[in-house]
């Protein structure tokens, strides 16, 4: 599935950091019960790729991606683990080329007009605006609209329930990303019921 098509299926992408592999399936089941089926697992912990493999095998109805990719080997490992999309914090042309070679949906992060222009040249039309709040928030995002009318974004970083609706009203926003539907303290408490409640709220933004 093309990344733009994938992002169009959701209002919010939960960005998850898995510390305990045993939390993976109940956490994802809780998110899915709330209506969120596109999930990003960050490549920041040792269990991350095992978690992706587990999700792809046990919960195939979830579109699981791997985030925090820094080099082509990260992308290759993500695909081999069963990821259906890849996310990076910045724009890396080696990653772009590897994703195209492997036919893996790829969402690179950008902040500036120069980065947007480079992404555009490589045929990328869906981008991650990251870190959204630090990069100017909604005001910063608005600056891309008149210059790049066919670019669309998934703003991520510093977004929560209070400002997500405002981002989603922008015509160049496909969805938002963040951890506000699955806070780390609720994961540590294994409070899946509360995570489902938050996921339901996020899915209806």
Region annotations inferred by a language model:
Residues 89-95, 128-138, 172-194:
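Glycine-rich phosphate-binding active-site loops on the catalytic face of alpha/beta enzymes
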């Amino acid at each position: 599935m093309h990344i733009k098509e994938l992002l169009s299926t959701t209002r919010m992408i939960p960005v998850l950091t898995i510390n305990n592999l045993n939390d993976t399936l109940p956490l994802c089941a809780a998110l899915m019960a709330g209506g969120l089926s596109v999930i990003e697992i960050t490549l920041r912990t040792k269990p991350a790729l095992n978690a992706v493999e587990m999700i792809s095998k046990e919960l195939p109805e979830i579109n699981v991606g791997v985030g925090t990719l820094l080099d082509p080997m990260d992308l290759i490992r993500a695909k081999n683990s069963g990821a259906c999309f890849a996310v990076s914090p910045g724009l890396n042309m080696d990653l772009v080329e590897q994703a195209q070679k492997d036919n893996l949906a790829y969402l690179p992060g950008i902040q500036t007009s120069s980065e947007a222009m480079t992404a555009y040249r490589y045929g990328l039309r869906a981008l991650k605006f990251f870190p959204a709040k630090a990069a100017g928030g909604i005001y910063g995002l608005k600056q891309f609209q008149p210059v790049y009318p066919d670019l669309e974004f998934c703003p991520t970083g510093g977004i929560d329930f209070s400002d997500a609706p405002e981002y989603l009203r922008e015509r160049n926003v496909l969805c938002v990303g963040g951890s506000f539907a699955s806070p780390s303290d609720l994961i540590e408490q294994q409070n899946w019921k509360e995570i489902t409640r938050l996921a339901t709220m996020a899915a209806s933004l």
